[in-house]
């Protein structure tokens, strides 16, 4: 085969795969960030994956437990097709950004078409604790990182003053009491002496 025909075939296969993924994304409306193992390796990445309880999403509101169908197809067949397509693309590193971008564009479309912003925020927000703790084994999500950065910025801006710290009488007294404790035999406290450093160097 010539190089052009191979490239054309690859391009058409890629387009077909993209169409399958886009169709699956349209069916799956709830996504969450999870740690996913890549292929047979021990490499794990943190990426958007569809929520596994998809049968609840496809349940029609008016229908009972009788036969459920979606556009003429049984729901189970549609779910299996969507799962198989998504599983094909979950292990590829190259598709991580594609799925993420596709999800972000879907949320923009959903938020512009929905009249209730509360429903959109419920579907988009991951089910993580509101704050990242150091004992957690997973890193925070993007929203949590920005909240922490804003919180830290607000605390540092409130602590920062325009004037440099000044030495007041209480500080002088505390220095003299420290010297007395050293003379008594108490363990010395660590302090920084700027005058001593400037004379040595």
From Swiss-Prot:
It comes from Danio rerio. It comes from the Eukaryota. Belongs to the BCL7 family. Residues 104-201 are annotated as: Disordered. Transmembrane segments: none annotated. This is B-cell CLL/lymphoma 7 protein family member B-B.
């Amino acid at each position: 085969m010539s190089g052009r025909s191979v490239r054309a075939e690859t391009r058409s296969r890629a387009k077909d795969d993209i169409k399958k993924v886009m169709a699956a994304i349209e069916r799956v409306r709830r996504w969450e960030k999870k740690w996913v193992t890549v292929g047979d390796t021990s490499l794990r990445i943190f990426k958007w994956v569809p929520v596994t309880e998809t049968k609840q999403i496809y349940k029609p509101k008016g229908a009972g437990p009788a036969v459920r169908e979606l556009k003429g197809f049984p729901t189970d067949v549609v779910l299996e097709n969507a799962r198989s397509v998504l599983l094909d693309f979950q292990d590829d590193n190259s598709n991580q950004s594609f799925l993420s971008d596709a999800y972000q564009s879907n949320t923009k479309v959903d938020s512009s078409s929905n009249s209730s912003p509360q429903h959109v925020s419920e579907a988009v927000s991951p089910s993580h604790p509101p704050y990242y703790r150091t004992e957690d084994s997973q890193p925070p999500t993007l929203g949590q990182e920005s909240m922490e950065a804003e919180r830290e910025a607000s605390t540092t801006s409130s602590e920062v003053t325009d004037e440099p710290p000044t030495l007041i009488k209480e500080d002088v007294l505390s220095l003299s009491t420290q010297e007395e404790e050293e003379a008594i035999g108490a363990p010395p406290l660590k302090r920084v002496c700027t005058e001593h450093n400037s004379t040595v160097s």
